[in-house]
């Protein structure tokens, strides 16, 4: 569940 947080930090849709 850490990958989801990383993606959100990259570009939060």
Swiss-Prot record:
Record GO biological process: L-histidine biosynthetic process
Alphabetically ordered keywords of this record: Amino-acid biosynthesis, Histidine biosynthesis, Leader peptide
UniProt key word Transcription regulation: no
Keyword Ribosomal protein: no
Family: Belongs to the HisL family.
Function: This protein is involved in the attenuation mechanism for the control of the expression of the his operon structural genes.
The name this protein goes by in its record: his operon leader peptide
Species assigned in the record: Shigella flexneri
Gene name of this polypeptide: hisL
């Amino acid at each position: 569940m850490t990958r989801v947080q990383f993606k959100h930090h990259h570009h939060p849709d």
